[in-house]
Amino acid sequence: TTLPQEILHIDTPVEYFRYFFTNEVIQYIVGQTNLYSIQCRPNKSVGVSHSEIEQFIGTSLFMSIIQLPATRHYWNSYLGHPAVNEVMSCNRWEEIKRFIHFCDNSNSVPASSPNHDKLFKIRPLLDKLRERLLLVPKEEFLAVDEQIIPTKCRSSLKQYNPKKPHKWGFKAFVLSGVS
């Protein structure tokens, strides 16, 4: 199968990211973040904007690649990096981090309920990303494998697989084509 033209013209990592994190997805995150901030502090909304969420995600991705011992070091005059400290102030970044949300907490189901979803907090975001992933056509020959995403955190979702190089982590199923 051939890829759609919109996918064939993706040349940069930013374009690839924007293919999955559409304006609709970013706007959804803006709405849920502002809603959560009002639920926490009725008199003072965080008032996050579309561009601030994009900047927050971008700086967070940058911080995951260029790692420093502490988050505040990115704004330090000696250790800091302009890709972070010129984009947003440290206090604003931490405020957005505190309130960023992907779902409406008022719709949560108790853990004892049979309808409880362990991924409730990110389920709407996962569903929106899945919609975009399903638009990418599948190749004729595919391989399915399970992959362990390594982590040292405590989570009921963490699994152990002695056959994998990283034994502990989150299990994900991977669909790979020949290309």
What are these regions (language model features)?
Residues 1-179:
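N-terminal initiation segments
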